[in-house]
Structures are given as C-alpha cells and as structure tokens.
Amino acid sequence: MKKPQEMQTMRRKVISDNKPTQEAAKSASNTLSGLNDISTKLDDAQAASELIAQTVEEKSNEIIGAIDNVESAVSDTSAGSELIAETVEIGNNINKEIGESLGSKLDKLTSLLEQKIQTAGIQQTGTSLATVESAIPVKVVEDDTAESVGPLLPAPEAVNNDPDADFFPTPQPVEPKQESPEEKQKKEAFNLKLSQALDKLTKTVDFGFKKSISITDKISSMLFKYTVSAAIEAAKMTAMILAVVVGIDLLMIHFKYWSDKFSKAWDLFSTDFTKFSSETGTWGPLLQSIFDSIDKIKQLWEAGDWGGLTVAIVEGLGKVLFNLGELIQLGMAKLSAAILRVIPGMKDTADEVEGRALENFQNSTGASLNKEDQEKVANYQDKRMNGDLGPIAEGLDKISNWKTRASNWIRGVDNKEALTTDEERAAEEEKLKQLSPEERKNALMKANEARAAMIRFEKYADSADMSKDSTVKSVEAAYEDLKKRMDDPDLNNSPAVKKELAARFSKIDATYQELKKNQPNAKPETSAKSPEAKQVQVIEKNKAQQAPVQQASPSINNTNNVIKKNTVVHNMTPVTSTTAPGVFDATGVN
C-alpha cells in the first residue's frame, strides 16, 4: 500500500500530465468559436450579396421595361408619322388632279375664244350703200320675184341660237346615283376607321412628346445629376453675373476716363489758361471756379488761417453754384430747342431760344464757345438787329438783359451798355447793316469772343498765384492773346464794341501791370512735387517699414538653431496600442 505522500505526488503528476490536453481542448474550443464567428459573418455577407443581386435584378428589369415602353412609343410615333405622310400624299395627288383638270378646261376655253374672235365678221354699215344710190342717176328697178316665190317656200324652222352656246355648252343634268346600303355601310365604316386612326395618332404623338421630355430629364439627371430646367436657370444666373461684371468694368472704364480728363484739365489750368479755356468750352467757368477754390483752400490750410479758410469755402461754394446754375439753364435751353426743332414750323423759334441762352451764358460766365454755338449767337444777334424777332422773343430778350445786368452788378462786373451810349450803338448797327451777311456775322463772332476772353482773364488774374513760374507764364500768354484779339481788323466794323473792349482792356492792363509790379520772385516748382518724386517717397516709406522685419529675422534663425541642437533624452514608459495585458503582465501564470 502506497503511502499518502506518494499518492499526493502521483496526483500532482496526473494533473501535470493532463495540462497539455486541457490546453489543447481550450485552444480547440477557441478555434471553434472563431470559426463559428467567421461562418456567421460569411452567412451575413452571402445574404447581403444575394440582396444586392436581387436589387440589381429588379432595377435592371425596371430599366428594361422603361426601354421597352420607349421603343413602343417610338414605334407608335413612327407609325403615326407614316400614316400622316400617306394622308398628305393622297391629298397632294387629289390636288394635282384638280389642277390638271382646271388647266385642261382653261386651255379649251382659250382655244374656243380664239376661234370665235377669228371667225367673227366685221359689222357693215349702210353709209356706203346710201352714197352709191345717191350717185346713180337712174332709178333702180326693184325685182318682185322674192314676193312671188316666198309663199311657195316651206316655213323655216324656228332656231333659237344662243351666241355663247358653241363654247359654253349647257351641261346635261346627271341624275344622282343611288348608293346601295352595303356601299353606304362600307363608306361609313371606312370613315370611322380613319377618324379613329387620326385620333390615335394625335394621342400617340402627344404622349410620345411628353414621354420624350420626361425621359430626357431622367437621362440628364442620371448622367449629370442635373435637369434641363435647372441648367437653364444656371445659365440665367451666369448671364446675370456676367452682366454685373461687365457693368462694373464699364463703370471703372468711365471713371478712369473722366479722372484722366479732370487731371488733364487741372494741368492745363495751371500751365496754359488759354488752351484750358478753348478745350473745356462751356464747362470751363465751372471747372475754373472749382480749381480756384481748391487752390485757395489749400493755401489757407497750409498757412493755418482758419478764418480765411471758412470765408474761402463759402466764396468758392457760391461761385461753383452760380456757374453750375448757369450751365443747367443752358442745358435746359438746348433741350427745349431740340424739342422745338422736331415740331414742324418751329425751327426758327428753336434757334432763337438757343441763341439767346448762349448769349446770356457767355456774357455771364465768359465761356469760350465752339464754332457752331458762335454762329448761333451771331445769327440771333443779326435777327435782333434787323428787327425780325417776334413780340414774345423781344420780351424774353429784355428779361434776359435785365437778369444779366443784375448779375453783373452783384458781382461787380461792368455791363457792355454802361461803357457805350445808345447813339454809338445805333450808329454801329447801321454800319453793320451795310456789310454783307458773312462779314456782319464774322464781326459779331469776333466781338463776342473778345468780350468773353476779357471776362475770363479778369477772373483768372484775381486768383492767380504769381509765385509759381508756370502761373506767371500762363498769365503772360493769356494777356498776349487779349492783345491779339484787340488788334483784330474785323473789330473796326464795330466801333461801339471796340470802344467797350478798349475800356475793359485798360482795366485789365492796369491789373496786369499791378501783378507784374508786386510779383514775388517766381521760382520753379520743386521737384518734390512732381509725380516721380512722390513715387520715390512712397517706395522709400515702404522700405523703411520693411527694415525692422528684416532686422528681426536673424534672431529668429538663432532661436531655431538652439532648439534644433537640444539633445536632452527623456525616459518614457513603454506603451502598446493593443488590448493585451501588457509587457509586465505577460509573464504571469494561470
């Protein structure tokens, strides 16, 4: 008998020997459960594949059915088109037969009319017979044979000849053919079938058209995920965006164009006042008042004279508004004249309205007019001189003269009536009437332009800054232009006007000499105010702003180098990304 100690040792041995078997069984059990999971997943995948296949099959059947419907609709449409073509062909044949029949009838009628005209005799009159009988001296013996033979002859048959019976025969009436019930029934059945076929054709075409549109939308939605209507809306939106972009571009182009024009006018005003006046035309007085106000405000701002700055702003605004009001009145007069010219018989009235407005505008502002406007003013003055204006025009002319006088008195400008007498103006009119129309018009135009040039120069000289070399040259050129106008020989035909201009020029000459006397040492403008110098200043300013950034960059590079050279090592705990028990628990015993 074994001892208990030996039995305990044997029990341990049995347990130790059974451990591989238990581990194998456990491993087999785990493997089996894994296989079961895989089998379940495969079953699910197979079921999903079958479901997908079934869905694909159903959708394929639906697509095939839709294609069959389309084919049937197309075939019905083709059949309907063929039926329509046959019907049209039958109608064309019938129309052709009718045309041929009408043509043959017309040919026959034409030939009969030609024969009738050719065989028709000329109607004889009794004039020749009466002449012959009167010329015969012997009386003709009449024969009574016809009277004796007449009763012996049989009576003639009555003949009712219609003159049109030979080529317009009366058609014989044809009795209508009686149709049998069978033929009538067949005809009605044919008509019924024809109407049913046409009705079916109409419905087929309508259905096919609607079906084609729906199929087109479906195809476009399948291919492009977009319908035709949505594409049209997108095209509209694109067109709207394009229109907005084009509009913005046009606005930018117009803004640049007018900005360049304004800059060019500013440069001309500072360097060549005579050319500035001729190029700006009716806009010259308004631009001159704007530029004068800006220069004066700029000078007072730099000097720090705030009281003078306020006065300059108010005066400049008043001048600008005055010139703008005169320009608006001229524009309204031109618009009224254009409307009157459209009305028949109102051309002369339109010329009077526009000529009066141009004359008042030039006398008030001193604007330089173009050749066409100068001729309109001269023609109006010529009509007024000859007394060709109506009573209404004369009344309006008096009102305009009163307005111009009041405006000149408020602004301290001399009126042309105050510099000459009525007798001198009357004598001048008589002298001008003796000239030819062309010479009279030329004299009036030269006088108007010379007076306007003097008004412009007076305004320019009052605000000219003689400390600038460019302004001094511009004033001298404008003064020389006035002297040339005064020496124009055409002004000799207008002695009163020449006296008026001489009085104005004497004041201008005194003002000019005063400007030359008090003129400071004119110096050319510094190069710092030129566009190139301003551009250089902007570039230098940008470089100065970028310099601190460029100086700070080396320190940043050094810091990066220090960071990159750091070799400190940190001991980190090992970490895994799996769900295993870990490195330290992996050596444990069950």
UniProtKB/Swiss-Prot annotation:
The keyword Phosphoprotein does not apply. Residues 1-35, 147-185, 515-535 are annotated as: Disordered. Keywords: Late protein, Viral release from host cell, Viral tail assembly, Virion. Residues 176-185 have a biased composition (Basic and acidic residues). The keyword Coiled coil does not apply. It is found in: Virion. It comes from the Viruses. GO terms for biological process: viral tail assembly. GO terms for cellular component: virion component. Serves as a base for tail tube protein polymerization and acts as a template for tail length determination. This is Tape measure protein. The lineage of its organism: Viruses, Duplodnaviria, Heunggongvirae, Uroviricota, Caudoviricetes.
